């Protein structure tokens, strides 16, 4: 497909914490560098190449009220259509009106679909019902625009729409045997660990303490990390049985077999870094980062849950979330414990975002104020990208700090490589890159490029 390239597995969750991209513009651009909208509201055009999970989009949208009023336009290029499908799912979930779904329920549902190999029955029902809606979105553009006008699918070709429809039909199918992810997870674990598989708990502990903890993700505790490494279940925020495969983690890839190369569906994503990096290791609520005797009091799950509640609160109400006093519970958090309403039962519309647009697969020149490349897609950063970057555009590159499988010297080498790629593409660093502490690197379009 156009602007979609195959690599070794999709990035279901990113390798760096979610960013409010407006915070990383360097320097904060004056209004005159923005493109002008018909309503004279300044635009900020953001290109995301290989963002994967939409975490940067979500955080930037949710925290937009903290910044001068402007129209945000996101342009998305992904390696796999399944990632675009997940973008649609998480965006739709984020926009569920608080009268329809409380913040607690929404946050738990998001994290469950985001980072769990296995989900609860009512979560699976929600996914099936949403899939029915998404099928109509990709097959009926007028219906999609009338319901979710901020999502622009006009650049997606008919062939790609057909493939998206097939993905959503697969999600809609309730048969758990179609995607035995517990089997796929174990097979990938065995392949990754090799002879260490029989002593895998020690391998898990080593990766956590000597890699993730040493690189700044100390809030992830061994209990949650080991359980995720073993089962693929990262978030269990409520009592329930997690036994239904999360089909949003399924993708197809060409694999070699005795009969030749075949297209196989399976789980081809991460099994070492964890979904905790995206939302669970940083927070504005400092009390969640407290330690006792050198051990974090709260877990990465606790932090992720708080962060999602905070983001969804800010999206719905336009103000920063405050933690309730001890012993108190805000009514907006716990809307209902019953099953989520089906599409037919919904009487409340989605949260309206008038000044946000999300486009898939763009092609523009001298246009983008901010460009983001994930570490899995940075090799596509070519000199030609300087022609689509606006004057003084910011380039943000994801680094490999939390990539467990890389040794120290590889982390250093990667920084050198991406700095050279950025320079060749016409960008200069805005600050010194420290491979030990930084998980992103920032550059600015050179004046003479």
Curated annotation (Swiss-Prot):
- Which keywords appear in this protein's UniProt record, sorted alphabetically? Cilium biogenesis/degradation, Cytoplasm
| Keyword Cytoplasm appears in the UniProt entry | yes
Q: Which Gene Ontology terms of cellular component type are present?
A: dynein axonemal particle
InterPro entries found in the cross-reference section: DNAAF3 (IPR039304), DNAAF3_C (IPR028235), DUF4470 (IPR027974)
Q: Mind listing the GO biological process terms from this record?
A: axonemal dynein complex assembly; motile cilium assembly
Q: Where in the cell is it found?
A: Cytoplasm; Dynein axonemal particle
Keyword presence, Repeat:
no
For this chain, the family text in UniProt reads:
Belongs to the DNAAF3 family.
Described by its record, this protein's role is as follows: Required for the assembly of axonemal inner and outer dynein arms. Involved in preassembly of dyneins into complexes before their transport into cilia.
What is the official name of this protein in its record? Answer: Dynein axonemal assembly factor 3
Native organism is Xenopus tropicalis
């Amino acid at each position: 497909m156009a602007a979609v390239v195959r690599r070794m597995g999709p990035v279901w969750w990113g390798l760096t914490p979610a960013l409010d991209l407006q915070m990383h513009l360097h320097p904060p651009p004056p209004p005159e560098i923005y493109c002008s909208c018909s309503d004279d509201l300044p635009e900020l055009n953001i290109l995301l190449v290989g963002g994967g999970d939409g975490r940067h989009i979500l955080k930037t949208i949710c925290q937009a009220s903290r910044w001068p009023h402007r129209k945000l336009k996101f342009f998305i290029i992904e390696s796999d259509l399944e990632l675009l499908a997940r973008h649609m799912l998480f965006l739709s979930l984020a926009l569920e009106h608080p009268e329809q779904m409380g913040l607690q329920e929404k946050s738990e549902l998001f994290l469950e679909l985001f980072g769990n190999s296995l989900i609860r029955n009512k979560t699976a029902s929600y996914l099936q019902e949403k899939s029915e809606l998404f099928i109509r979105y990709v097959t009926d553009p007028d219906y999609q625009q009338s319901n979710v006008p901020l999502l622009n699918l006009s650049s997606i070709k008919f062939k790609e729409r057909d493939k998206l429809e097939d993905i959503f039909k697969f999600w809609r199918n309730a048969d758990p045997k179609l995607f035995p992810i517990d089997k796929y997870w174990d097979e990938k674990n065995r392949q990754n660990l090799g002879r260490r598989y029989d002593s895998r708990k020690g391998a898990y502990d080593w990766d956590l303490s000597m890699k993730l903890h040493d690189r700044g993700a100390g809030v992830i505790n061994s209990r949650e990390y080991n359980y995720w490494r073993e089962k693929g279940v990262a978030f269990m925020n409520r009592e329930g049985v997690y036994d239904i495969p999360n089909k949003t983690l399924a993708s197809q890839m060409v694999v070699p077999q005795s009969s030749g190369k075949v297209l196989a569906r399976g789980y081809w994503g991460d099994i070492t870094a964890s979904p905790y990096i995206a939302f669970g290791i940083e927070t504005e609520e400092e009390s969640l980062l407290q330690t006792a005797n050198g051990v974090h009091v709260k877990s990465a799950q606790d932090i992720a849950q708080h962060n999602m509640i905070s983001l969804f609160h800010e999206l719905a109400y336009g103000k920063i979330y405050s933690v309730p006093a001890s012993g108190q519970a805000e009514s907006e958090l716990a809307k209902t414990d019953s099953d989520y309403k089906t599409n037919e039962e919904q009487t409340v519309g989605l949260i309206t975002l008038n000044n946000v647009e999300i486009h898939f697969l763009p092609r523009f020149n001298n246009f983008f104020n901010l460009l983001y490349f994930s570490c899995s897609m940075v090799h596509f950063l070519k000199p030609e990208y300087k022609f689509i970057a606006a004057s003084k555009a910011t380039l943000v590159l994801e680094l490999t700090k939390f990539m467990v499988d890389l040794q120290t010297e590889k982390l250093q080498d990667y920084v050198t490589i991406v700095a050279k790629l950025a320079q060749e593409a016409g960008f200069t660093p805005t600050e010194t890159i420290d491979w030990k502490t930084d998980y992103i690197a920032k550059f600015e379009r050179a004046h003479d490029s």
